[in-house]
Amino acid sequence: MSTVATYSYTHSVTYVTDNILKSLKDIILLSGLDPEHFADRWESNTRAIKTWLGTGDLRKVILEIYNPATDKLVTRWDIDIVYGWSDGDGSFWTDTEQLKYAIKKAGLLPSQAKYKLMLDTKPGRPDVEGWSKGSYRSTDGMVKQSLGSTVEHSGLAGQAGYWRQR
């Protein structure tokens, strides 16, 4: 039984990792931003998310979109991780339509905007090559719009939301 449960959790981690990254790629593309930087770091992003999901240390995936001239946040997308995994029925889904609707609602971003992927992890998490500590840009004057669950596999889930100006 533990072999089956281990395989299933590994499958959940892979599914959730892949679909979080696909969702972020959609956000970047549909917001009118250049996906080249994101594509160039795909392997590193996959390795970090998969590692920290697997150890239970990943708390949040954050895509900061900022004005490079002022270094101020334009918008921010958060995917909060929910660890409610069970080896039950193996249900899985990704709500791409909900995400596309929210991206459309948030609107196109200035073409000069840049983005940065950040991962919020628990203290004591294992190191992943290419990743280090960082700090977030301020969300002062912004309000978060929650979308709810956008990806789930057997209870391991990502709940998306975005920050907009008040």
Swiss-Prot record:
UniProt cross-references to InterPro entries, sorted A to Z: Bact_HORMA (IPR040649), HORMA_dom_sf (IPR036570)
A Pfam family per the record: bacHORMA_2
N-terminal signal peptide: none
Impact reported for residue 95 to K: No longer binds to CdnD
Ranges for region Required to bind CdnD: 134-166
Keyword annotations: Antiviral defense
Listed Gene3D superfamilies: HORMA domain
Keyword Repeat in record: no
Entry keyword annotation includes Cytoplasm: no
GO biological process per UniProt: defense response to virus
Function as written in the Swiss-Prot or TrEMBL entry: Sensor protein of a CBASS antivirus system. CBASS (cyclic oligonucleotide-based antiphage signaling system) provides immunity against bacteriophage. The CD-NTase protein synthesizes cyclic nucleotides in response to infection; these serve as specific second messenger signals. The signals activate a diverse range of effectors, leading to bacterial cell death and thus abortive phage infection. A type III-C(AAA) CBASS system.
Record-stated family: Belongs to the bacterial HORMA family. HORMA2 subfamily.
Domain notes: Can adopt both open and closed states. Full-length closed state protein binds a closure peptide (consensus Glu-Val-Met-Glu-Phe-Asn-Pro). In the Cap7:Cap8 complex only Cap7 binds a closure peptide.
Summary of subunit composition and partner proteins: Interacts individually with CdnD and Cap8 (also called HORMA3); forms CdnD:Cap7:Cap8 (also called CdnD:HORMA2:HORMA3) complexes with stoichiometries of 1:1:1 and 2:1:1.
Name of the protein described by the UniProt record: CD-NTase-associated protein 7
Organism phylogeny: Bacteria, Pseudomonadati, Pseudomonadota, Gammaproteobacteria, Pseudomonadales
